[in-house]
């Protein structure tokens, strides 16, 4: 409703809920050929892996990981994007574009954490798209050297999708069973600030 009145700046935050074996909104899909994930949730007393902005994190020991983002053709209408920011753990394998239009994507891989333990990689696409295919790389940045898989701790948190237009960018975060107290952790609040919210609605 707000985006209809004030403009639509993009889908905003999306997280791999389905890969973490919980409910996912019906306007996007995040899929992977990797089947086994360890999942951390903000509601866990002893978290199985670190959690990110969306209150979850997914972790895999696979030496090769892909993440495919797709906006749902009906429920996601109007949420095409030309920029995606991937939030990952500091020791996670970086991702590079894959698929038919990978050459039209400008990739900026972070070298310095945006906040403690979190890297934010930016993918700028030359035209609006409804899909983004990413595949991990073990190549050391700026070299041809392949690093051993044991060097990495592959934790991924989610994406922020934008379209470059002015308007409302609405981020919805939440985990089944979560309460206010689950979102007051100091580390979580620092991560939430990465989205630069102008208004928080609890």
What are the residue ranges of the model-derived segments?
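Conserved SGNH/GDSL esterase-like catalytic core that processes O-acyl groups on lipids
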Residues: 2-107, 111-202
């Amino acid at each position: 409703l707000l985006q209809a009145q004030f403009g639509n700046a993009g889908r905003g935050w999306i997280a791999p809920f389905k890969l973490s074996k919980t409910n996912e909104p019906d306007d996007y899909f995040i899929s992977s050929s990797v089947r086994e994930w360890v999942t951390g949730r903000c509601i866990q007393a002893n978290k199985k892996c670190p959690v990110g902005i969306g209150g979850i994190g997914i972790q895999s020991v696979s030496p090769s990981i892909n993440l495919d983002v797709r906006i749902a053709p009906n429920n996601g209408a109007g949420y095409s994007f030309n920029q995606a920011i991937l939030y990952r753990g500091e020791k996670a394998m970086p991702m590079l574009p894959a698929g038919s239009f990978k050459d039209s994507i400008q990739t900026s891989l972070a070298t310095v954490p945006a906040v403690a333990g979190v890297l934010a990689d930016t993918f700028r696409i030359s035209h609006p798209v409804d899909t983004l295919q990413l595949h991990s790389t073990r190549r050391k940045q700026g070299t041809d050297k392949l690093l051993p898989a044991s060097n990495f701790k592959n934790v991924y948190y989610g994406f922020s999708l934008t379209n470059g237009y002015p308007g409302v960018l609405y981020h919805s975060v939440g985990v089944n069973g979560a309460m206010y107290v689950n979102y007051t952790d100091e580390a979580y609040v620092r991560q939430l600030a990465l989205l630069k919210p102008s208004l928080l609605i609890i």
